[in-house]
Amino acid sequence: MSSAYLASLACPRCQRDYPESAAFTICPACVDEGQNVNPAPVYDLSRLGPGWQPDRGQPGVFAYRDLLPIAATTVPVSLHEGSTPLVPAPALAERLGLGELLIKDESRNPTWSYKDRLAAVGVTKAREAGADTVVVSSTGNHGAAVAAYAAAAGMRCVVLT
């Protein structure tokens, strides 16, 4: 089971809808046509309501757990990613003719990359599925992030470069 607000998975290429519990990561209809396309989540955000707030009692990106494809009973793998600061950049704002410019400082994440957000959810989902190993293809930040989160989860990690 996943997010209460996840309605389905939809293929952006062929527009087919699949149940959110589908046990595949590539659209079967497109694979039959020689195309590898990942279905994207379709959320029913109308069910959130105007008073919805992130759950600040959850670590990192899991404050937004209601919107993530993670079962309510799954313990998240988090290194307290996210909640990175916005840093004012007045000189650059002036040079660009902007009244104000804020730059998100993602180097404050555990592996110094915004990829930590994806790694936290991906490794949590892998553990939820019963995996003991995660495998990724990366030449940099994504591999480092997944390796860190896999280690935190007690899982093996293979990074293909």
List PLM regions with ranges.
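PLP-dependent amino-acid enzyme catalytic core
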Residues: 1-161
